[in-house]
Structure formats: structure tokens, C-alpha cells
Amino acid sequence: VKYVHYIKNFLKNNDCKTLLDYGCGKGHLYMEEHYESVTDVIKEPLPYFWNLDSYHLYDPGYEDFKVLPTEKYDAVICTDVMEHVPEEDLGWVIREIFSYAKKMVFVNVACFEALKKFRDGTNVHVSVFHHQDWLQFLAHESCNHKDLTIYPFFDGFFEDDVDHVLTQGYQIDSYPRIIQFQ
């Protein structure tokens, strides 16, 4: 929810009218009957708030959304997903995400362990890396997608402030050139 306004601006700036939410969860923010129970940050479901012509929700963990799309979309967003992907699968997952985008990708990654654990005690955030490592990984993977603008946002504890989760946002464009948002 905290990124809906950022994403709205990125969609507008990149003239995006179609969207894939890769790892959408239950997709409640997209549904007229559910979005109000999830947040008061927006006053309408995301397709209207973002002025989308069409969208596709994908999440292999939910029966209603487990079908991969068959087409490309102007934008792909992926929030709170990559840290749950085992390290050995990160490459193919991000390449798959990039392959569905025509114009832009928004990726949000938590760079810290989660409070939740699997039954065996393993943290559910199985790929926890420093935001600079994520940034370099995404920049490297974006080299084969020079037509895309990538917006990675990282949540973490920065500059030894362990009391507050902070967010740092970047833009990776066609060079690849990395720009930090201030």
C-alpha cells in the first residue's frame, strides 16, 4: 500500500495503461468489494486509481491467480516477493518479471529478516541481502532489457539505524545508469 502513489507516478510518466502484478497475493486492492477493508490510503480500487485499461494478477500461491500471463504488459510490479525467492532461483525469476514488461518494472524488496518463520525455524525471507547487492543484481540483469526503466525500492535498516525501517528508491535506465531518489 505504501507504494501506490509512487507507482501511480511511474505509470503516468511512462505512459503505462496495462499492468501485471507479479506476486499479487490475494489481490484485494484491485477489487471493488475488498480494497476498502485493506486500506484508507486510496479511495478506489487500483485499476481506477492507476488509470489502467487492463491488468493481470499473478501469484502461484493463490489458486485464483496461479496462471502466468500469455502477453506482455506496459508495466510489471513486484512487491514483497523477491526476498521470499530462494537465492538459486533469483536470476530466472527476475528475468521472467522483466520479460513480461514493455516499458517499466517496479520492484520492492525487504532487506531484513521477517518476523515469520517456517515450521523448521527458517526465516520466510530466504534471500536477505544488502540493498546495494540487490541494486547491482538488478542492474546486471537489466542489461538485456535496455528498453525498460527499472524502479527498485528497498526497505531496510540503513546507516546503523536499527529502530526504523527506511526505504531507498532508485531508477535503473537503459545505460544501465543508476539514479537514487532523494
Predicted segments, located by residue:
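A short beta-strand submotif of the Rossmann-like class I SAM-dependent methyltransferase core
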Residues: 75-81
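Alpha/beta-hydrolase-fold catalytic nucleophile elbow
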Residues: 108
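Conserved acidic-Pro-Pro-aromatic motif
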Residues: 99-105
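Conserved N-terminal segment of class I S-adenosyl-L-methionine
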Residues: 1-75, 91-94, 100, 111-137, ...
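Conserved beta-strand->loop/alpha-helix structural units within folded catalytic cores of enzymes
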Residues: 81, 96-97
